[in-house]
Amino acid sequence: QRQMCIRDRGKTRPAVPKRTKSEQGIVVEGLSNCLVKFAKCCTPVPGDDIVGFITRGYGVSVHRTDCPNADPARRKPEEKGRWIKVSWDDSTRENYSTTLEVVAKDRLNLIMDISTVLSATKTWVTNMSARTTNDGFALITIEVGVSDSTQLSTVRRRLEQVSGVLRVTRPAGR
């Protein structure tokens, strides 16, 4: 069982901060043997700019820097020391889960066309839900597994090319 994060508080500090990577492919500056989890509000993937937050009892929560929950303007003064520098390790795992939201003009075979794009881009789909609004739009939420932000950008671009799709976004700060 891994321990929660423990800050190095020795009297003498090395000139270079300690860099320890986690099993999730995250390097946490100044912390060793640290539990790392990805924030569900913004679901970061390799290539995203990220920041860490030392939680109470759950290790370091990794957020995208553009996540509203990680916005420096919204940070509480008493939590200042709990925001830490984190980065992606060069050797990351195969798939990272994130969410895409698609808004499209509803039409026959829309889901099939979206599924075709996901298959063609070799994108893992772990969950997909869709609903139609009263004004004829389709709102589709897709949980996908991607290797990095480059693959995610490709998937987004290809989905935006599907007939009737108005926008494809990545939610942040749920």
What would you call each of these model-derived segments?
Residues 1-6:
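Short, small-residue-biased leader/transition segments that mark boundaries at the very start
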Residues 10-13:
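Flexible, glycine-rich loop/tail regions that form catalytic "lids" or insertion modules at the edges
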Residues 15-19, 23-29, 61-68, 90-94, ...:
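Generic detector of short, locally flexible boundary/turn motifs and exposed helical patches
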Residues 24-27, 34, 46, 58, ...:
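Helical mechanochemical/support elements of P-loop NTPase systems and associated helical scaffolds
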Residues 28, 40, 55-60, 100-104, ...:
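Hydrophobic alpha-helical scaffolding
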Residues 43-99:
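C-terminal, non-catalytic macromolecule-binding modules
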Residues 80-174:
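A conserved regulatory-domain signal marking ACT and ACT-like small-molecule sensing domains
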